[in-house]
Curated annotation (Swiss-Prot):
Protein name, per record: Interferon alpha-inducible protein 6
A GO BP annotation: negative regulation of apoptotic process
GO terms under cellular component: mitochondrial inner membrane; mitochondrial membrane; mitochondrion
Topology term for the membrane: Multi-pass membrane protein
Keywords: Antiviral defense, Apoptosis, Immunity, Innate immunity, Membrane, Mitochondrion, Mitochondrion inner membrane, Transmembrane, Transmembrane helix
Length: 130
């Protein structure tokens, strides 16, 4: 059920980027952008989703546990030192390991796609300010 809700939300965000001119702004006869930003947003979402799914195993958060001599091992060591010898349940390292070990690539991909979309909107708003 949660996956359907997230998927519907992402579809809504994609359709929202396709909406024309915002209220109160004049429509330009010629635009430097050939479209509504849909393809650019889709590119950011695809890259974000792909990096999120491939990123956790690349950092060392694998299904078999945290890989030795990896970024994940360093994060686990730092977390244990800062917390008096143990990694806290529900902390960043534990959450990332849970996502990496669970193989929840759909949820991770959706989160990455959402982050890609947020990056697209942020960069798009900065271009509008200039």
């Amino acid at each position: 059920m949660r996956q359907k809700a997230v998927s519907l939300f992402l579809c809504y965000l994609l359709l929202f980027t396709c909406s024309g001119v915002e209220a109160g702004k004049k429509k330009c006869s010629e635009s430097s952008d050939s479209g509504s930003g849909f393809w650019k947003a889709l590119t950011f979402m695809a890259v974000g989703g792909g990096l999120a799914v491939a990123g956790l195993p690349a950092l060392g958060f694998t299904g078999a546990g945290i890989a030795a001599n990896s970024v994940a091992a360093s994060l686990m060591s730092w977390s244990a030192i800062l917390n008096g010898g143990g990694v806290p349940a529900g902390g960043l390292v534990a959450t990332l390991q849970s996502l990496g070990a669970g193989g929840s690539s759909v949820i991770t991909g959706n989160i990455g796609a959402l982050m890609g979309y947020a990056t697209h909107k942020y960069l798009d708003s900065e271009e509008d300010e200039e």
